[in-house]
């Protein structure tokens, strides 16, 4: 089965040379006006490969292992508590999670002096591209590609959920790929424990992949939110178009109900809020669309699985474990090669009263685990 894909990056292959600073212990680069200052073991040239709301990413070479790696710079990481917590959360989670379908964190680069710890540089394994870029490209994708992508997403999610963690921000750009189609889940900055019930005010996950219970501000959400996101991604791989590209919350719910039909009273019992139930009941009513007509390129086993993922009531939505056992993935499913995490992840470090300086200290301590401080 030929699964190779071509690399696709937005920023080209521009190589940028560096200059040695701090007595030769660090390389400094100017990347499109962004200062990059990293340990001298990450040798030039480096090349920019991506930018986003939470950082700028460059590829470089680790001179000790001769591997090409990705370095994400989070600028002014401790200027506000929300971003600082996000950075700490992602570092701690990726150190805890060890799975073939979860991106590997390799290093955290510290500045020479603790008082200069303003920007955070996180080193990851390098992947060639992401699913968003592949979907938007002219790269041909067949059903084998789709099966393999979906299987790896679910395999990684099974492990993540078994660690008592919800990703909460699954979308094509957070699914990294290499040229032989190996897939890794990234960006755990919004992750939460499965047992939390408090609604997250900083929740900023991309609206298009957001489950109905989140759109309706349900305070008690479960791992089913990630399954909904996977369903949206599954359909997007097949059609090369976002499934529910809502312009706002109201439009998002309208697009959802136009496809899967307006929920009946029994499907709203998961909503504790009487106001939320009343709101949904007063929305325009839509019948359920025929999925075979809506997705003519999908075979019957793919449609069967998609329908089970896109269920309004999270209680009735298929679980990751059940999805892995579905006929659509039977050629890939192997229970003995779908590991779970041996230990639950604890978010105990997230003290709401923590200051930016206290969070900075915790991130500094994380960096020490990768690079112990020199003994005096």
UniProtKB/Swiss-Prot annotation:
It holds the Pfam family Pkinase. The modification Phosphotyrosine is found at residue 203. This is Mitogen-activated protein kinase 5. Activated by threonine and tyrosine phosphorylation. Activated by the MAP kinase kinase MKK2. Activated by the MAP kinase kinase MKK6 in vitro. The active site is at 169 (proton acceptor). It catalyses: L-seryl-[protein] + ATP = O-phospho-L-seryl-[protein] + ADP + H(+); L-threonyl-[protein] + ATP = O-phospho-L-threonyl-[protein] + ADP + H(+). The TXY motif contains the threonine and tyrosine residues whose phosphorylation activates the MAP kinases. PROSITE patterns: MAPK, PROTEIN_KINASE_ATP, PROTEIN_KINASE_DOM, PROTEIN_KINASE_ST. Keywords: ATP-binding, Kinase, Nucleotide-binding, Phosphoprotein, Serine/threonine-protein kinase, Transferase. It comes from Arabidopsis thaliana (Mouse-ear cress). ATP binds at residues 49-57, 72.
């Amino acid at each position: 089965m030929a699964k190779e894909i071509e690399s696709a990056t937005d920023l080209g292959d521009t190589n940028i040379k560096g200059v040695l600073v701090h007595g030769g212990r660090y390389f400094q680069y100017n990347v499109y006006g962004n200062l990059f200052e990293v340990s001298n073991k990450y040798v030039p040239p480096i090349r920019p490969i991506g930018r986003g709301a939470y950082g700028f990413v460059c590829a470089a070479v680790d001179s000790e292992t001769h591997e090409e790696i990705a370095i994400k710079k989070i600028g002014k990481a401790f200027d506000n508590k929300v971003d600082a917590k996000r950075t700490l959360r992602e570092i701690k989670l990726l150190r805890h999670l060890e799975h073939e379908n979860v991106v590997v964190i390799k290093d955290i680069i510290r500045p020479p002096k603790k008082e200069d710890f303003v920007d955070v540089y996180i080193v990851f394994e390098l992947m060639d591209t992401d699913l968003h870029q592949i979907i938007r490209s002219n790269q041909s994708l067949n059903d084998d590609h789709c099966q393999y992508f979906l299987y790896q997403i679910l395999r990684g999610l099974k492990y993540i959920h078994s660690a008592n963690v919800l990703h909460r921000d699954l979308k094509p750009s957070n699914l990294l790929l290499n040229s032989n189609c190996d897939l890794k889940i990234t960006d755990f900055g919004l992750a939460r424990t499965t047992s939390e019930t408090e609604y997250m005010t900083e929740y900023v996950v991309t609206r298009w992949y957001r489950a109905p219970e989140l759109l309706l501000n349900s305070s008690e959400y479960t791992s089913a939110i990630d399954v909904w996101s996977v369903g949206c991604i599954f359909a997007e791989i097949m059609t090369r178009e976002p499934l529910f590209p809502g312009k706002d919350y109201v439009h998002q719910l309208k697009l959802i109900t136009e496809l899967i039909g307006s929920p009946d009273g029994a499907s709203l019992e998961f909503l504790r809020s009487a106001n939320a139930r009343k709101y949904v009941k007063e929305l325009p009513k839509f019948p359920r669309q025929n999925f075979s007509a809506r997705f003519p390129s999908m075979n019957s086993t793919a449609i069967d699985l998609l329908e089970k993922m896109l269920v309004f009531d999270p209680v009735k939505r298929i679980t990751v474990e059940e999805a892995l056992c579905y006929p659509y993935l039977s050629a890939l499913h192997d229970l003995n090669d779908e590991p779970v995490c041996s230990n639950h992840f604890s978010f105990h470090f997230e003290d709401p009263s923590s200051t930016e300086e206290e969070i900075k200290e915790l991130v500094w301590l994380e960096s020490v685990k990768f690079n112990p401080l020199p003994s005096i």
